């Protein structure tokens, strides 16, 4: 009797563990297939169709291929793989003539990879994560253990941010990824955090192109925003109503204001440098002022939930990219804040993977 593939239930723990181990080497393929799908605009093509259900041939006819018939056969395998990862839904129907017709449509998960009404998505961040420049650095992970090397520096001979300054393509890729991720996170932050109410002025330290402040001021138009970053960064920043772009160096001094934002700044620094930046923030605040740190918080113990997996994954990313960079626990943030002179710290909200941590001067 032939073994049926339908309704298979595997309950043997030893078999399950071995099957998981066999699947581990396949993890690379998901990111690489997603990279190809985004570069080919597959998700956007499906989203823009009138039915939002397309066959591999219908998709292939909309991408720059010389032979849609041949390409659709390869594309079909890509689409089936994505469906197996819950990134597409596979629909199989029979035509009147008895032939099988297969179409694919988006799932809630793949919706995050297409542009929303503001033109943002997770796709640019995935392209950054799978770019050969960063991937090449991963091959030197063992050198961080054996030689104390920074993997990115070992791979490319320079610090990550210095590399971005020399490679306009990579710099553009990085900026686009950060812009999209910031837009997505800040939409949630202004929804879940009310600590900006009643504030007259906000300083965003390392604010890049001013996207975080723009999101805040869109909800609180009476706030004056100062977007503080290096001169070569803010020179390309767009004009926003209510925001002044100020060039400077956070290592020297920070503009004075009642509320200072540090978003995704501390995790790229070692502890000593974190304290230096936090001390400069402390000096720039009035006695009743506060810093709002927006970072991931690493759990004390590794767990298998999404928050834990993302935090420990990004911790590896920081180890690859920066000397002393790391994700930190709540206690580690408290220790840094106290060393810098802050008297009270409170975790007040979460937006996706980022936590909002208030540091009070007095």
UniProtKB/Swiss-Prot annotation:
One of its GO biological process terms is: methylation
EC no. given is 2.1.1.267, 2.1.1.-
Tell me the keywords, alphabetical order: Methyltransferase, S-adenosyl-L-methionine, Transferase
What is the name attached to this protein's record?
Myricetin 3'/5'-O-methyltransferase 1
Residues annotated as the enzyme's active site:
267 (proton acceptor)
Q: Which GO terms describe its molecular function?
A: flavone 3'-O-methyltransferase activity; myricetin 3'-O-methyltransferase activity; protein dimerization activity; rhamnetin 3'-O-methyltransferase activity
Enzymatic reactions: myricetin + S-adenosyl-L-methionine = laricitrin + S-adenosyl-L-homocysteine + H(+); laricitrin + S-adenosyl-L-methionine = syringetin + S-adenosyl-L-homocysteine + H(+); a 3'-hydroxyflavone + S-adenosyl-L-methionine = a 3'-methoxyflavone + S-adenosyl-L-homocysteine + H(+); a 5'-hydroxy-3'-methoxyflavone + S-adenosyl-L-methionine = a 3',5'-dimethoxyflavone + S-adenosyl-L-homocysteine + H(+)
**Expression (tissue specificity):** Mainly expressed in leaves secreting glandular trichomes types 1 and 4 and, to a lesser extent, in storage trichomes type 6.
* PROSITE patterns in UniProt: SAM_OMT_II (PS51683)
UniProt family annotation: Belongs to the class I-like SAM-binding methyltransferase superfamily. Cation-independent O-methyltransferase family.
- Sorted alphabetically, which Pfam families does this protein's record hold? Dimerisation, Methyltransf_2
Q: Which gene encodes it?
A: MOMT1
Q: Which Gene3D superfamilies did the record assign?
A: Vaccinia Virus protein VP39 (3.40.50.150), Winged helix-like DNA-binding domain superfamily/Winged helix DNA-binding domain (1.10.10.10)
Its quaternary structure?
Answer: Homodimer.
Against InterPro entries, the record matches this protein to: COMT-like (IPR016461), O_MeTrfase_dom (IPR001077), Plant_O-MeTrfase_dimerisation (IPR012967), SAM-dependent_MTases_sf (IPR029063), WH-like_DNA-bd_sf (IPR036388), WH_DNA-bd_sf (IPR036390)
